């Protein structure tokens, strides 16, 4: 990235200059600008990883819920499986768990780790016991991250190129589209004013980060064992607000009224979830690579 555009190199090795008033990085988890400028910060609390594959002939419900995604908690309550029916009688099945449980102690046999997790989780085992695995195993480590900056002079990052949150509540598409919407408004406004500064292009980021933090809080509460069922039973007047949060109403301060009564139900000694950057020095947080291992064994 350079002033007024960027330098690119094609698959044929030929380099070229591309002129642009604003460079918008929507490169997904490749996060080209985030990696170039060493902006990535890993979540200090959601230190998780995932292993997944695809199965043909796995159990599928019928009727109106045939394509519904399922979340199945592991018996130790430290992790969960996703179970996502897809086309061609295929189901995506993946386990999300603490990093050390999946990869600690030099564990590199991802198939064995996945199968052990399945054996411990009857709700998953019975659904895939008669299925055929259609692919190898995909692996990603430490996958909750965010960029220190959403913009610079002449550039913006959005979607997974900005950040990724543990997908427990399937917030990824919502957050990607919202960041794109907000960034687009800032870019259009900036171009009209002749202002493509960092401040102008990233004016949307503080409010967006606040919204991510609300969803992150719900995810962390889940992993911490908090019972939203008991909470709603005790505070039926907040049922609608909790529902609003879970379905993505993350960008309105009115939803913050749930946190004080939620914390009042904590057991003695439990503290509120620390802020995103708490406890993770920036030099450590930016050293790790976001590894995605695909079935051929390559890093992507």
List PLM regions with ranges:
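Predominantly flavin-linked oxidoreductase catalytic cores and closely associated redox partners
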Residues: 1-126
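Tryptophan-centered motif/residue detector
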Residues: 22, 52, 80-82, 137, ...
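Short glycine/serine/threonine-biased micro-segments
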Residues: 26, 77, 92, 152, ...
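Short secondary-structure transition/capping segments
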Residues: 33-40, 94-102, 170-173, 234-253
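A general structural signal for short secondary-structure boundary/capping elements
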Residues: 68-74, 97, 117, 128-132, ...
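FAD/FMN-dependent oxidoreductases across multiple families
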Residues: 101-186, 192-203
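C-terminal helical "tail/cap" subdomain of flavin- and related membrane-associated enzymes
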Residues: 185-300
């Amino acid at each position: 990235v350079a002033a007024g555009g960027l330098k690119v190199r094609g698959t044929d090795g030929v380099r070229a200059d591309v002129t642009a008033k604003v460079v918008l990085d929507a490169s997904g988890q490749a996060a080209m600008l985030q990696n170039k400028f060493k902006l990535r910060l890993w979540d200090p609390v959601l230190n998780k990883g995932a292993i997944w594959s695809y199965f043909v002939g796995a159990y599928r419900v019928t009727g109106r819920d045939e394509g519904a995604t399922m979340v199945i908690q592991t018996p130790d309550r430290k992790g969960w499986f996703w179970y996502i029916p897809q086309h061609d009688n295929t189901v995506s099945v993946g386990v999300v768990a603490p990093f050390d449980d999946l990869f600690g102690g030099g564990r590199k046999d991802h198939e064995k780790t996945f199968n052990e997790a399945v054996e411990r989780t009857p709700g998953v085992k019975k659904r895939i016991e008669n299925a055929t695995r259609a692919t190898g195993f995909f692996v990603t480590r430490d996958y909750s991250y965010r960029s220190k900056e959403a913009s610079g002079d002449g550039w913006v990052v959005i979607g997974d190129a900005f950040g990724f949150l543990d997908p427990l509540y399937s917030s990824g598409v919502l957050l990607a589209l919202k960041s794109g919407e907000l960034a687009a408004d800032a870019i259009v406004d900036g171009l009209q004013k002749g202002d493509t500064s960092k401040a102008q292009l990233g004016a949307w980021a503080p409010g967006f980060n606040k919204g991510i933090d609300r969803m992150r809080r719900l995810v962390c509460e889940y992993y911490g064992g908090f019972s939203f069922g008991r909470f709603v039973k005790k505070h039926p007047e907040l049922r609608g607000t909790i529902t609003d949060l879970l379905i993505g109403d993350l960008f309105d301060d009115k939803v913050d009224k749930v946190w004080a009564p939620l914390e009042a139900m904590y057991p003695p000694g439990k503290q509120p979830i620390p802020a995103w950057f708490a406890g993770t020095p920036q030099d450590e947080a930016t050293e790790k690579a976001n590894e995605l291992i695909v079935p051929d064994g390559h890093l992507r």
